[in-house]
From Swiss-Prot:
Chain residues forming the annotated DNA-binding region: 54-80
Positions of the UniProt region annotated as Disordered: 33-53, 125-150
Record protein name field: Transcription factor TAS2
Amino acid composition bias (Low complexity), ranges on this chain: 42-51
GO cellular component assignments: nucleus
Signal sequence segment: none
Recorded phenotype for the gene knockout or disruption: Impairs the ability to produce TeA under the DMSO-added, TeA-inducing culture conditions.
Length: 771
């Protein structure tokens, strides 16, 4: 029908109103249809009485004894639960419809969780480039709740697995005498016998005091002990022992108590505030060795009994760390570390944040499990970029674990029952440096994954791959929170040992960075295109080694109270409050002395290569940081390493190893006469003598490296100059210190100017660099 021209044209408002009226009419019709359908449908009767039978008995129409759990569920190994009325399905609903709704709800929850993860992504300091792809973090992908069928299947599988474990892990109780565990009347009596059998525990009040010292003086970067839970263990162990119920005492808990006390005694010093005090450092050393041996005996007893407990895993990790600091990276250390990883897996700690984990642990205990797992995992990954027998390998695969990152909290904050409570990265806590250690470990794992045993340093692609890995270290160092920067002042309320913790953290970063770039030191600038291509890698390696040398020597000077010579005075750690930081345990930390040793080896090798070449790249900087300065720093570091050997067996052995490596490659020269007068200096004192004597009395056979005095070190006589002799005044011929190293340097190379591998030149160096 045509519109009459006499009428005005219909405007847009007319059509808009017509559309709105049509929509309203359709909506009203749909509303009437829905009301009619709901009225004609069957009405669902409400439940008159509360449900008394469990879900399993009700679904299978069997009699329920209404126990908790009931007999039917207990027989089948299933969880006994009663479905709430709000979640109960209607009687008229079909199974297909309920399954479809379940899948729809699961999909919606997954999409919502993924959206929240994308929008509110965590910006914690540990979130590096490899966190989102490795799948190890519990928050890497959303946790979707298990459906009823999935939960029943997992419970059945767990029941069958536990039945198998009970049959296959029978303890060997026959043929051995149970370990005798007693409580001494005084702390001195617990180690005065000098033998670990019977195992003597210190009095209860002393054990509680040392637990507080272990947690509050966290110089060891091991926040895997919670004061409240550990004190509860002590309160259970001591009354049982005093009542004579030794069969009711778990030896793993005894091992944890002894391991904590042994660590406190090993790092004890009278100048550090603590709740438990020894009379002398020699007494603390004796107690540490006896308690450590007793803890190992108790841990072996727990293994014979087939004990599985969180305390056993904690004890194994602490004993591994203590063994590393006492003996270095020995075979026992590697076995204890592997045992700690296995203990965590047996307890399911690697799945503490998985979908199927239905643990009833408290918030503090769950957080403790996260810290323990990340400690053993980080140690495992760092050993992969560490040298020694485990170099280039790791056993903890990130996709086989589901554990969230630890939160940035102090030990006292764990008492708050909250899973979301955490401090910002710029707030220093007892876990701040530990989180950065995890980040370092993840970088080490990615570096190991990017390399192959068949890689050749002559390949340019390998150099590019190494530089890409080095960029990970660089970004991690540059993005550290302000309190963890070396030159930053210590904030108010920071942990007591934050200064030492962050210095050890930077040692780990720069030492492994230097180790990554170390193979390219074999090329010189005069080696044509390859020498020019690898120049940046060599410069970064030397710079990182110098940083390690400066940090470690500054720490040892502060700990040993040795004044640095004026020409080599460094400012890298001279921040406000540096000298007020506790320093006593530093020279007993194997991390510091090991990294110092490897930095000295790298710089000595680089210095010798430059001396042997016709071009000296640092000739223009001879006045500040030139070769003469580097020679003096190396000699001073050598002196500090030997001085630390008075109380640290690892440091004393590393001095022997350094001279052994030099002698093996015919670098024996004037190094044995660093002192211009050629005089001898007995560097080993009474503390090392006490340690060796205690090891002998405890049943440990002392090897050649554990003898006392300069006689134990044939090449050490005269190697250490007089402490009263000033350096840099012409009396100490620093130029002769490393002249023997570049003697016969051409013998280090094979024909056709093809360098032998770095591992052949420094065959023994890698095994002495600790995690």
């Amino acid at each position: 029908m045509r519109q009459n021209s006499d009428y005005p044209s219909l405007g847009p408002f007319f059509f808009a109103g017509k559309i709105k009226l049509s929509i309203a009419t359709e909506s009203f019709s749909a509303m009437k249809r829905s009301r009619a359908e709901s009225a004609s449908g069957p009405q669902q009767p409400s439940r008159r009485q509360p449900q008394t039978s469990c879900d399993l008995c009700r679904s299978r129409k069997i009699k329920c004894d209404r126990g908790t759990p009931c007999g039917n569920c207990r027989t089948r190994g299933l969880a006994c639960s009663i479905m709430s009325p709000s979640s109960a399905p209607s009687p008229g609903a079909s199974s297909a419809e309920s399954a479809g709704h379940g899948r729809l709800d699961t999909a919606i929850l997954a999409r919502l969780a993924a959206l929240e993860q994308a929008v509110f992504r965590s910006t914690s300091a540990v979130g590096g480039s490899g966190n989102a792809e490795n799948g190890a973090h519990g928050d890497a992908t959303p946790r979707v709740p298990l459906s009823g069928l999935e939960r029943e299947g997992r419970q059945t599988a767990n029941f069958l697995d536990k039945a198998y474990d009970r049959c296959s892990s029978a303890s060997t109780r026959s043929g051995y005498r149970p370990l005798d565990i007693r409580v001494a009347e005084s702390c001195r009596d617990s180690f005065a016998t000098g033998a670990p059998d019977p195992v003597w525990l210190m009095p209860q009040k002393d054990a509680v005091a040392m637990v507080h010292d272990f947690v509050e003086n966290i110089y060891h970067l091991m926040p895997i002990v919670h004061i409240g839970s550990t004190v509860s263990v002590i309160d259970n162990v001591y009354p049982a022992l005093q009542a004579g119920n030794i069969n009711h005492v778990d030896p793993a808990q005894v091992a944890l108590i002894l391991g904590i006390c042994a660590a406190c005694a090993f790092f004890w010093d009278g100048g550090v505030p603590c709740q438990h005090r020894f009379e002398t450092e020699g007494e603390a050393t004796s107690a540490s060795l006896i308690w450590k041996t007793s803890a190992l005996y108790a841990f072996e007893e727990a293994q014979r009994r087939g004990s599985r407990s969180l305390e056993g895993a904690q004890a194994c990790a602490i004993l591994a760390y203590l063994t590393y600091n006492m003996d270095g990276p020995s075979t026992r250390f590697y076995r204890l570390h592997t045992c700690s990883v296995t203990a965590c897996r047996e307890l399911g700690i690697h799945l503490v944040d998985s979908r199927g984990c239905e643990s009833t642990d408290s918030t503090a205990r769950r957080e403790l499990k996260r810290r323990l797992w990340w400690h053993v995992a980080a140690t495992d990954w760092m050993l992969g970029l560490n040298g020694g027998p485990l170099d280039g390998t790791y056993t903890v695969h990130p996709r086989q674990a589901r554990v969230a990152l630890p939160r940035n909290l102090n030990d006292s904050d764990l008492a708050i029952d909250s899973e979301i409570l955490t401090m910002p990265p710029h707030v220093p806590t007892q876990a701040s440096c530990f989180l950065q250690v995890i980040r370092l470990a993840e970088i080490c794992r990615m570096v190991v994954d990017s390399q192959s045993p068949d890689d050749s340093i002559a390949d340019t692609a390998y150099n590019e791959r190494v530089l890409a890995s080095d960029e990970l270290f660089k970004k991690a160092i540059e993005s550290m929170p302000p309190p963890l920067v070396l030159t930053s002042p210590i904030p108010e309320g920071a942990p007591r040992f934050l200064c030492l913790q962050r210095a050890s953290l930077h040692l780990g970063f720069h030492s492994r960075r230097a180790r990554l770039l170390r193979p390219f030191l074999l090329y010189k600038d005069s080696d044509g295109r390859q020498g020019t291509t690898y120049r940046r890698s060599r410069e970064l390696c030397v710079r990182s080694a110098q940083t390690v040398l400066e940090i470690s020597t500054s720490l040892l000077e502060h700990s040993l109270r040795i004044r640095s010579p004026e020409p080599f005075r460094r400012q890298i750690l001279h921040h406000p409050g540096h000298h007020s930081c506790p320093a006593s345990p530093i020279h007993r930390l194997g991390v510091v002395v090991n990294h110092l040793f490897c930095a000295c080896a790298i710089l000595a090798f680089e210095c010798s290569l430059r001396k042997n070449s016709s071009v000296h790249p640092r000739q223009q900087h001879r006045g500040a940081g030139g070769e003469d300065d580097l020679d003096g720093m190396l000699v001073h570091a050598y002196r500090l390493l030997a001085a630390a050997g008075e109380e640290c067996t690892v440091a004393a052995d590393l001095v022997c190893a350094m001279r052994g490596v030099f002698a093996k490659y015919r670098v024996d020269g004037d190094l044995a006469t660093v002192d211009g007068r050629g005089g001898q200096n007995q560097i080993v004192g009474s503390s090392r003598s006490a340690m060796a004597s205690v090891q002998t009395s405890a049943g440990g056979a002392c090897n050649e490296q554990q003898q006392i005095g300069p006689a134990a070190w044939p090449g050490m006589r005269g190697a250490i100059p007089d402490e009263n002799q000033p350096m840099g005044e012409g009396s100490l011929e620093t130029g002769k210190a490393w002249d023997g190293f570049d003697k016969d340097l051409d013998d280090l190379f094979v024909a056709n100017d093809t360098y032998c591998s770095w591992d052949q030149i420094f065959a023994r160096l890698g095994s002495y660099c600790g995690p």
